[in-house]
Amino acid sequence: EVKFHKSRNILKLLVNSDAHVEILSKSDLMVEDIGLLKEFRDLSVGISLNTLDDDFRKDMEPGAPSVQRRLNALEKLHSAGIPTYLFISPIFPYLTDIRAILRETAGNIDKVCFENLNLRGSAKKEILGYIAERYPQHLDGYKAIYTKKDTAYWTKLEAELQSMSAG
């Protein structure tokens, strides 16, 4: 993307269309295209984020921009009048502090979306191993969710999110 600007070139093709354009990225590169983004009639830009802990981010998303760069991108885009949203994904049980993320992004987002951590195939073994090594205090909780299919954590979280959105 940095070298070839594929997204920018696609956006240039769409700018005069009536297409609804929604961009979701972990990257902060779209800040460079604020002028182009402002030309769209129906556009929103989302940033994906699941932690404020940059060490955890480095473990889970080693090639992605830092947490601060993503937060800065949201602020710059929103300040420029571009509709923005936050995609908290994936939510790592017991580790993703949704309330802290929402406090940090308040005033810079127009909406928020959520997605839970889904573990399939080799990712399940890899993540459970990571949790056992780095966050052993949460391993039983992860095993309950991802081995025993216990949905209590997600049910409680969903109720909390609904309560937050109502208040």
Model-derived features: where do they sit?
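Charge-patterned, long linear interaction tracts outside catalytic cores
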Residues: 162-167
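Rossmann-like AdoMet/SAM-dependent catalytic core
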Residues: 157-159
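Conserved AdoMet/S-adenosylmethionine-binding subsite of the radical SAM
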Residues: 1-154
